[in-house]
Amino acid sequence: MSEALKILNNIRTLRAQARECTLETLEEMLEKLEVVVNERREEDSQAQAEIEERTRKLQQYREMLIADGIDPNELLNAMAVTKAAATKSKRAARPAKYKYIDENGETKTWTGQGRTPAVIKKAIEEQGKSLDDFLL
């Protein structure tokens, strides 16, 4: 809550601040505050009306489904299955494309994606080898 709202929410602070203002100024501030409060009430009532309308429509559609012999839970389950099938599945790991021996003497493989292993990079730059020399 901001300092201005804390002042407006505290009656003692309001009284102290009101002593420094004229009655006309206080009445003008009261009118403006009433306008803001009325606007907020309208917004809240409109939001509540939208929620009630949505609830009414959902109930109406539920009754229509039941009248047509469809259980709403059955529809939800069918939609969940469809949604699960539409979600992205993990792609399969790429097969290794290159083979090399690292600094420890271990044979390793590389798919060709991502950063080039340091051993391969060094061999290409310093020994003049090509990437084809490391193909499986």
From Swiss-Prot:
Entry keyword set: Coiled coil, Cytoplasm, DNA-binding, Repressor, Transcription, Transcription regulation
Q: Which residues bind DNA?
A: 113-118
Question: Which GO molecular function entries does the Swiss-Prot or TrEMBL record give?
Answer: bent DNA binding; DNA-binding transcription repressor activity; minor groove of adenine-thymine-rich DNA binding; protein dimerization activity; structural constituent of chromatin; transcription cis-regulatory region binding
Gene Ontology annotations for the cellular component aspect, listed alphabetically: cytosol; nucleoid; protein-DNA complex
S-S bonds: none
Compartments where found: Cytoplasm, Nucleoid
Q: Which SUPFAM superfamilies match?
A: H-NS histone-like proteins
Q: Does the keyword Transcription regulation apply?
A: yes
Q: Which residues form a coiled coil?
A: 13-67
Q: Write out the function statement from the record.
A: A DNA-binding protein implicated in transcriptional repression and chromosome organization and compaction. Binds nucleation sites in AT-rich DNA and bridges them, forming higher-order nucleoprotein complexes and condensing the chromosome. As many horizontally transferred genes are AT-rich, it plays a central role in silencing foreign genes. A subset of genes are repressed by H-NS in association with YmoA. Complements a number of hns deficiencies in E.coli; represses the bgl operon, represses hemolysin expression.
The UniProt entry's sequence similarity note says: Belongs to the histone-like protein H-NS family.
PANTHER family on file:
DNA-BINDING PROTEIN H-NS (PTHR38097:SF1), PTHR38097
- Assembly notes: Interacts with YmoA in the absence of DNA. Homodimer that oligomerizes on DNA into higher-order complexes that form bridges between disparate regions of DNA compacting it. Interacts with YmoA.
Question: What is this protein's name?
Answer: DNA-binding protein H-NS
Recorded source organism is Yersinia enterocolitica
